Amino acid sequence: MFQGLIWVGLALSLLLALDRIFSSDFDDGNLDIILRMEISYDKIYLSKLLSVWITYCLPIVIIVPLISTVFNLTINETIFITVNLFCGSFGMTATAIAINALLMGLKRMIYLKSIIIIPLYIPFMIFGVEQGSWPVLSALSMIAVVIASFATSYGLRLYGE
């Protein structure tokens, strides 16, 4: 039960971040400046991926071992949850960035973005609560990071034109 609560908490924290990933840069014109500086779209994507992951996912990954003592989990269960959360959170963050880049021009459409992204989070959550599924979760995250890189580049290219 604890694993499910943690994964739902991670999904909700990323849904809160969903409207802020590119919107502040988009609203104040910094995204135009960044795109005119001829910085690679992949560098923009990787910087957003790391900044969103450090801001929204890393605190949850750090807090999980502390909270697991409240639920009387063993060391093995705590390590399992932390490793799965670490592996899956990159894929969930990459998915959020890709959806936000593709729907960047839409103002205040957090509900539409949420409806699109929640079904994409379900495989991460299913494999995240299963014990011993970290290799599958890691592969799923790597695939999501690669596909999201292309989707984010496409979304930024559409905006730049």
Role assignments for model-derived ranges:
Residues 24-51:
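Helix-loop-helix units of permease transmembrane domains in multi-pass membrane transporters
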Residues 121-132:
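Hydrophobic alpha-helical transmembrane segments in multi-pass integral membrane proteins
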